[in-house]
Amino acid sequence: MALRTGGPALVVLLAFWVALGPCHLQGTDPGASADAEGPQCPVACTCSHDDYTDELSVFCSSKNLTHLPDDIPVSTRALWLDGNNLSSIPSAAFQNLSSLDFLNLQGSWLRSLEPQALLGLQNLYYLHLERNRLRNLAVGLFTHTPSLASLSLSSNLLGRLEEGLFQGLSHLWDLNLGWNSLVVLPDTVFQGLGNLHELVLAGNKLTYLQPALFCGLGELRELDLSRNALRSVKANVFVHLPRLQKLYLDRNLITAVAPGAFLGMKALRWLDLSHNRVAGLMEDTFPGLLGLHVLRLAHNAIASLRPRTFKDLHFLEELQLGHNRIRQLGERTFEGLGQLEVLTLNDNQITEVRVGAFSGLFNVAVMNLSGNCLRSLPERVFQGLDKLHSLHLEHSCLGHVRLHTFAGLSGLRRLFLRDNSISSIEEQSLAGLSELLELDLTTNRLTHLPRQLFQGLGHLEYLLLSYNQLTTLSAEVLGPLQRAFWLDISHNHLETLAEGLFSSLGRVRYLSLRNNSLQTFSPQPGLERLWLDANPWDCSCPLKALRDFALQNPGVVPRFVQTVCEGDDCQPVYTYNNITCAGPANVSGLDLRDVSETHFVHC
């Protein structure tokens, strides 16, 4: 569909430009011909003749034309008139262009099309009329384009469509009516479009869909009704769409979905009901959707989830329920979702998750529970989620991690616990996470780490502990992290680092110690980036090795790093990495790298 996937129009656009490769471009000068012995190219246009296909394309885009060129060659196959100031298309304007199969009139300030404007275009395949000022279209306008496969009328001012407007377009495949001002559609407006595969009605003002509206559209694959003013989804509206695969109902005003509203839609793979006002889901809301893979219900007003609500969705792979008002997850909430891979429940009001809430989710790989207020999670609440590899619990009011909170997550790769209030983590509570690669504990209230906290995490590569209240860090704690690559312990209260703290971490390449209370530090070999700023460094003899290391490796310990900037108005941002001396007094305020060699002469 043009709106969601780029659509045939974009494919054609690219195809024509690719075709220019072997073409001989002419016509940039008035009177230039498209071929040495061929027809003349219109003044102010550019012509391209493909020697391989023997097809002629005429480009008259953005020439500020107020009327159509008079001398368009009759052999033209593609005509680009977009971006002009045409106002209207008179009758029989293209009557001599019987070979034309592509016509682009988008963005040309068209206010009207005469009923016979398309006369003679019996071979036209693609017609672009989007981004104009059209308010109405005469019945019979398209009777002259029986071969039309793609018609785009999006972003006009259409307030109504007459019955019979699309009569005779039996080959139409793609129809885009999005971003107009349509309020009501005639019952039979789409009759005769038996081959239609993609229909866009997004961005209109539709408040109601009558049951007969989609009769005869048995081949339809995608239907976009997003960004309208629909208030409910009635039964039997979509019953005539047995082959529909994608249905977009997002960003409407829907408060209720009738029982069996989607009955018979066995081919449906994608259903988007996000950004509405749906308050509740019933057990009979989704019966019959045996082929559904994606269900999006985020940004609604759902307050609770009843058991067995999703029982018929055996092949569902993605379920989005974020940004609702769900308060509790009870047992068997997700029963029947054995193929589910992605479950998002972020930014609800969940305060309680009962053991058994996630039972049956044998294949779930990503779970997002962030933005709730769980405070604590019952032990073994994630039991049985053997294939879960990413668990998001950010900003969830967690204060404590119990011994068996994460029991059963043997395949977990990424655990996100940042922006909580975690002040304690029980010893070995992470021991079962043998496949963990990334652990994010940023912005919590940790003052110390249990000695065996990371026992069993031999595969961990990324450990983020910044913005806590750590005062000490023992070598025994980090010892098991043999594969640690990225270590961030910035913004803590560390005053000293234990001897040999990082010696066992031979793979560490990124180390951030900024914003602590460190006075000394011995550099580690193998580092690729070291952040040391905002510490009260004692620039006496013990820091000479760090000075030499920093001077010899400016790429590892840069004075500043410029953030990559994009856009014309983007201002570069610099992150500084100062090693500012707090003492002795004679070098106080200097950067360690600027302290002279004579200062260390007696070391």
From Swiss-Prot:
Q: One Pfam family from the UniProt entry?
A: LRRNT
Its keywords, alphabetically, are: Cell adhesion, Disulfide bond, Glycoprotein, Leucine-rich repeat, Repeat, Secreted, Signal
Transcription as a keyword of this entry, yes or no, is: no
Q: Does the keyword Signal apply?
A: yes
What are the LRR repeat spans here? 75-96, 99-120, 123-144, 147-168, 171-192, 195-216, 219-240, 243-264, 267-288, 291-312, 315-336, 339-360, 363-384, 387-408, 411-432, 435-456, 459-480, 483-504, 507-528
Residue ranges occupied by any LRRNT domain in the UniProt entry = 32-74
> Which Gene Ontology MF annotations are present?
insulin-like growth factor binding
Q: List the disulfide bonds.
A: C41-C47, C45-C60, C539-C581, C541-C603, C565-C570
What domain of life does the UniProt record list for this protein's source? Eukaryota
Listed GO biological process terms: cell adhesion; cellular response to dexamethasone stimulus; cellular response to epidermal growth factor stimulus; cellular response to growth hormone stimulus; cellular response to interleukin-1; response to nutrient levels
List the record's Gene Ontology CC terms alphabetically: extracellular matrix; extracellular space; insulin-like growth factor ternary complex
> Primary place of residence?
secreted
Q: Which residues are glycosylated?
A: N64, N85, N96, N368, N515, N578, N586
Compartment list = Secreted, Extracellular space
Q: Which SUPFAM superfamilies match?
A: L domain-like
- Which proteins does it associate with, and in what oligomeric form? Forms a ternary complex with IGF1 and IGFBP3.
Name-wise, this protein is Insulin-like growth factor-binding protein complex acid labile subunit
**Organism the protein comes from:** Rattus norvegicus (Rat)
